[in-house]
């Protein structure tokens, strides 16, 4: 399997909704994360125990903040990677099934990471709204005191 080809293909899929390619740092970040995921998927297939969290978390942070991708779209990208890797590895039906089962661990980790990121985004937005509300209360209190002192 041509690892570089798989990584480039998947990074292109991750950036498909962008009419203009993002800045170099974003593309580089995604390439590094994609390389980790491809390497760890191969390690899982070989029966090795690997930590997926950091590799998957990097991609899911990007996808969870992208309004163009919902949860299903984000997980679908991982399924496309699974299928593309299986094709590139020229796996027969039985081996493809084995690879798919091993890859499920990545899918489950990706879903958990996506939901954790979305939850954090929601918490941050809620804190922002609460801060805005508190600021409005202070403005109203100040205006009320200012008007009552004029009387």
Curated annotation (Swiss-Prot):
<protein>
    <recommendedName>
        <fullName>Uncharacterized protein AF_0915</fullName>
    </recommendedName>
</protein>
